[in-house]
C-alpha cells in the first residue's frame, strides 16, 4: 500500500517518463519510459503549477536569448539559487541564514530612470522606479536591497564619497520632493563592484501602495558635502551593459497563520518527555508470530524514483533552473514483522499486529514519506521579474511504515 503526499504524487510514474528529453537531462536509471499524450501533459502541467503555487503558466513578454542569463538581476538570482540548492543538498543552514530565511526572493529591474545631473541646479541625484505590482499578498518582507554597479571614477581621483539612498514619499511641484532616508554607504572614488544599499524600510510602503511607487533617489557627496553627479562618481544606470544594470532584490517569508490556543478544562499537568519512535533493532515479537511472512514477491517499503522534467513539459522559456529534479515517492509492503529498515512507528507495528488477527477489520500499515525536503525553482514571471521560490516538502528523503 503506498501513500503520496499532495497532488504531485497523484501523477505517479508518468512524470518519471518525462525525463528523457535531451542531453544531460535523462532521468535516473530505473525510470519507466512513456510519453504522455496532449491531454495528459496538460493535466500534469496543471497539477505541477498548483503545487508551485502559480495560478497559471507565466508568459514573459520577451523570452530570453539562448544564453538565458544575460542581465544583472538573473545572474544574481542564479547565484542565490545555487546557494539555496547547495544548502538543501547538505541539509545545513548557512545559505538559508544568508538569505534571511526567505521562502521567496523577487528581483525588480529598473523601469524608469531620471537624473538631475550636470547643467542642473544642485544637489545632483539619480532616481529609479520599479514595477512592484507583482509583489505577492500574504508575504512578509524580511529584507530588501538596491544594487548598483560602480566603476572607478577618473574625475574624482581617489576621494572618499558618501552615497545615500532615499525613498520618494511625495512629489512637490514648487520645491524638493518629500524624502525618507533609507541607507548611507561610504566608499572610495576608485572602487569597482556592486554597491548594496539597504531599502528594507521602504517595503511597508510597497506592500500598501503597489501601484503608487514614487521610486528611490540616490545622492552622492564628497567628504566636504559637495554634491556629485552619480554618473561622474562611476555609478551606472540604465545605459550600462545588461550585466551591470541596477535592480532591487526583495526577500519574503510567508506570514505564519495565527495558531488558536485550545482552552483547558482542567489544570495542565507536566508532561513527560516524549520517547523516540525510532527503534534500534528489528521489530520482532517472539513466539507465535515467528513464522509469519509478508506477501511473497513484494518489495518492502522503500523510496522509488520520480523525476519531473521542466524541459519536456515545455517550460524552459520561463523556468531558469532547474531543468528537472527528482521528487521520489514511497511504495512497498508493510507486512509484519516490520524490520528496522522500514522506519516503522510504534503505531504501525501495533496496526500490523492487529491486521494479522483481523485482516478484514484493520488494514495494513501504509508506506509513506518520513522525511521531506524543499526544492527551489528560479523562473521569470509574466512581467519579466525573476523569482526564486523555495517549495517545502517537495522531495522525499526517506520512507517508512505508518
UniProtKB/Swiss-Prot annotation:
Pfam families linked to this entry: TGF_beta, TGFb_propeptide
Chief location bin: secreted
Keywords, ordered alphabetically: Chondrogenesis, Cytokine, Developmental protein, Differentiation, Disulfide bond, Glycoprotein, Growth factor, Osteogenesis, Secreted, Signal
Keyword Signal tagged: yes
Annotated localization: Secreted
SUPFAM superfamilies xrefs: Cystine-knot cytokines (SSF57501)
GO MF annotation, one: growth factor activity
InterPro entries attached to this UniProt entry: Cystine-knot_cytokine (IPR029034), TGF-b_C (IPR001839), TGF-b_propeptide (IPR001111), TGF-beta-rel (IPR015615), TGFb_CS (IPR017948)
One of the GO BP terms on file: cell differentiation
Glycosylation site positions: 158, 343
Signal sequence annotation: 1-19
Function, as annotated: Induces cartilage and bone formation. May be the osteoinductive factor responsible for the phenomenon of epithelial osteogenesis. Plays a role in calcium regulation and bone homeostasis. Signaling protein involved in regulation of thermogenesis and energy balance. Proposed to increase the peripheral response of brown adipose tissue (BAT) to adrenergic stimulation while acting centrally in the hypothalamus to increase sympathetic output to BAT. Growth factor of the TGF-beta superfamily that plays important role in various biological processes, including spermatogenesis, osteogenesis, steroidogenesis as well as regulation of energy balance. Initiates the canonical BMP signaling cascade by associating with type I receptor BMPR1A and type II receptor BMPR2. Once all three components are bound together in a complex at the cell surface, BMPR2 phosphorylates and activates BMPR1A. In turn, BMPR1A propagates signal by phosphorylating SMAD1/5/8 that travel to the nucleus and act as activators and repressors of transcription of target genes.
Subunit: Homodimer; disulfide-linked.
Protein name: Bone morphogenetic protein 8A
Organism field: Homo sapiens (Human)
Amino acid at each position: 500500500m503506498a501513500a503520496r503526499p499532495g497532488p504531485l504524487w497523484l501523477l505517479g510514474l508518468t512524470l518519471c517518463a518525462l525525463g528523457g528529453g535531451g542531453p544531460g537531462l535523462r532521468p535516473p536509471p530505473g525510470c519507466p519510459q512513456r510519453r504522455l499524450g496532449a491531454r495528459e501533459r496538460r493535466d500534469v502541467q496543471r497539477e505541477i503549477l498548483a503545487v508551485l503555487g502559480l495560478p497559471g503558466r507565466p508568459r514573459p513578454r520577451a523570452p530570453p536569448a539562448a544564453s538565458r542569463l544575460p542581465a544583472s538581476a538573473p545572474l544574481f538570482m542564479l547565484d542565490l539559487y545555487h546557494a539555496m540548492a547547495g544548502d538543501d543538498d547538505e541539509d545545513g543552514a548557512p545559505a538559508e541564514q544568508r538569505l534571511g530565511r526567505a521562502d521567496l526572493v523577487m528581483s525588480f529591474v529598473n523601469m524608469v530612470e531620471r537624473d538631475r545631473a550636470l547643467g542642473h541646479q544642485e544637489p545632483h541625484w539619480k532616481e529609479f522606479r520599479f514595477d512592484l505590482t507583482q509583489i505577492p499578498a500574504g508575504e512578509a518582507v524580511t529584507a530588501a536591497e538596491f544594487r548598483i554597479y560602480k566603476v572607478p571614477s577618473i574625475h574624482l581621483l581617489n576621494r572618499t564619497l558618501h552615497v545615500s539612498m532615499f525613498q520618494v514619499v511625495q512629489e512637490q511641484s514648487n520645491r524638493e520632493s518629500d524624502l525618507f532616508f533609507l541607507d548611507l554607504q561610504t566608499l572610495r572614488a576608485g572602487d569597482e563592484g556592486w554597491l548594496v544599499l539597504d531599502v528594507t524600510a521602504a517595503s511597508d510602503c510597497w506592500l500598501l501602495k503597489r501601484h503608487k511607487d514614487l521610486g528611490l533617489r540616490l545622492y552622492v557627496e564628497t567628504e566636504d558635502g559637495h554634491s556629485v553627479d552619480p554618473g561622474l562618481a562611476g555609478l551606472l544606470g540604465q545605459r550600462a551593459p545588461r550585466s551591470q544594470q541596477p535592480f532591487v532584490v526583495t526577500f519574503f517569508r510567508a506570514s505564519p497563520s495565527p495558531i488558536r490556543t485550545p482552552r483547558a478544562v482542567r489544570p495542565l499537568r507536566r508532561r513527560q518527555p516524549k520517547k523516540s519512535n525510532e527503534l534500534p533493532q528489528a521489530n520482532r515479537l517472539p513466539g507465535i508470530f515467528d513464522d509469519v511472512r509478508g506477501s511473497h514477491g513484494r518489495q518492502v517499503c522503500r523510496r522509488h524514483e520520480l523525476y519531473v522534467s521542466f524541459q519536456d513539459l515545455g517550460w524552459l522559456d520561463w523556468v531558469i533552473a532547474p531543468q528537472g529534479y527528482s521528487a521520489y515517492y514511497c511504495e512497498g509492503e508493510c507486512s509484519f514483522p516490520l524490520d528496522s529498515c522500514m522506519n516503522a512507528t510504534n503505531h504501525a507495528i501495533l496496526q500490523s499486529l492487529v491486521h494479522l488477527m483481523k485482516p478484514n477489520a484493520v488494514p495494513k500499515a501504509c508506506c509513506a514519506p518520513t522525511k521531506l525536503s524543499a526544492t527551489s525553482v528560479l523562473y521569470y514571471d509574466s512581467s519579466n521579474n525573476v523569482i526564486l521560490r523555495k517549495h517545502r516538502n517537495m522531495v522525499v528523503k526517506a520512507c517508512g511504515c505508518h
